[in-house]
């Protein structure tokens, strides 16, 4: 079984990630979190993700609402193993 999350950005500093999350929280977006991952060239990506959804369709519907509200420009849905 899998769950789905929406990645809305990937930035190269924790400060950028925190700023973006702060802005989105002020606009009412909940369930945001950061995943820190290594870049191939060294350094880190700070991947900003939101939500855990039982289906890909629900994740897409939520992400499309964020796009329609002009809160994000693009996204992609990621499947994760259920814990």
Can you name each region flagged by the protein language model?
Residues 9:
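Conserved beta3-strand ATP-binding lysine motif
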Residues 2, 12-83:
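Extracytoplasmic
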